[in-house]
Amino acid sequence: QLDLRELLKRGNGLFGSAEMTGSIGVVTINMARLGYLFKGNKVELFTQLDRLLYISKSTLEKKRVFIQEMYDRGLYPYTKRYLQHFRNHFSTIGVNGMNEMIANFTENKDDITSLTGIEFAAEILEHIRNRMKEFQEETGNLYNLEATPAEGTTYRFAKEDKKRFPNILQSGQGENIYYTNSSQIPVEHTEDPFEALFLQDELQCKYTGGTVLHLYMSEKISSPEACKQFVKKVISNFRLPYITVTPVFSVCPVHGYLNGEHEYCPKCDEILIEEKKLKLSN
């Protein structure tokens, strides 16, 4: 018997994606818009957030009923071969644009990289977690909080908001506007992976569904052993559940893969220099 007074984390496999669990559906909340509409008014912001959370619950419960009905009618024959029920499946709620929410709420005095911003984001995520515990007790179904990938949603939210609220603070420029994913730091904020880890550790631990911190290494990782030691250091000193390590590289049409970031290919430059020297010597 599951204790519905606590939020569970998916077990087994990468991101807990074992065959007996998953998400019934995902609702992503546009946090940036809340920050703009209720700037400086925390009470109203939380009131509106609650309204959106209740709408999310209603939507996800209706979807669960619909999927169960389709399953019972035999319209998911392949699923029925390996899945006996949906009781271990989560109703998932996620957030997008937490960084821009803080910037709009504070009129650009803070963002998610400041201590004030981190504390505010943590307060909001904890509030969502508490509401989800209530939803679990009320419905008997599992809920989780996820850093939804929002690859398309982040652009769509920003585009819609720009039409309605021309003065809203967003990331990007011109046509390439977007909101920073979930509660991540701005993409251009730091190249130091340990600074990113310190800024994100508390917030990453608030999620009970899928979340990951991508660490882009501006310097070359010299060997698999060096990467292993780096990962060991991270998991020994930080609590966040998932990380990826991506070395920065460049691709030359002639010489292919090059370690590090290069505006111009150094191998091509060497060839050009040699050719120039030969011409000058002749």
Protein language model annotation of sequence segments:
Residues Q1-R87, N108, S114-I118, A122-N282:
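Conserved catalytic cores of very large enzyme subunits
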Residues S91-N104, E126:
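Contiguous, well-ordered alpha-helical segments that form the cores/surfaces of helical PPI scaffolds
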